[in-house]
Amino acid sequence: MLAAVILSILAVVIGQIAVTTIKHGLGLRVVGSVEFPIVVLTFITYTLLPLFAIFVAIDMFNGESSSNTMKITLLRPVSRFGVFSAKVLNLALFIVGNLLFVMLLSLLVGFIFNPASASYMGIVKVILSYGLTFLPVFVFALIVVLLSNVIQGGLAVFFLSILVFIGFNFMGIVFSSYSSFFITSMFDWYTLWISESINVFKIFRQILIMSGCGIMLFTTGYYLFDRKDI
């Protein structure tokens, strides 16, 4: 958790340093106070955020299994579904907390360095963008949860999750016509909501795809967790 906070702060600080350097070095205003959080979001969504989600998911399932703390948890008067749901909920709360922290920090930094460009609608777009990013990242995290209940070793799950992430991004580019079926291609789906013209059909289609994938991954993950010999 501490590592996530430190790296998130570094991402925001480095981003602002880059923007300030370009502004003073070339005389160009790259982004304003409300555009800066969107730039930061684009960066962390494809780098730090999924990486943090992978680490947390592995720690919750493979980590507890290897340290035998899972057995202690299951000895309590609670069903396996309750344990699994609690772990998934904690994973979801971690993603929400990380997004909220980065959003507030990047907004603060943006206001400090570019106070004149702040606007109410800009802030609304930032909040909407960060909120919408939760769904695709959470669905990807459920893939890691599924892998954690299939493979025993945490290191193997980590590398496989990274390969899945890279593979989905690669296939989303190569097979652009079918990119909607690769969850990582929807990490930036918030742009559909904040653009000048809103494509309602595409938004609805992606909501259905992510919801369907999320339900199937959660159900399959729980089935494997329930059958798992701890």
Each predicted region: which residue ranges?
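Transmembrane helix-loop junction
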Residues: 63, 76, 107, 111, ...
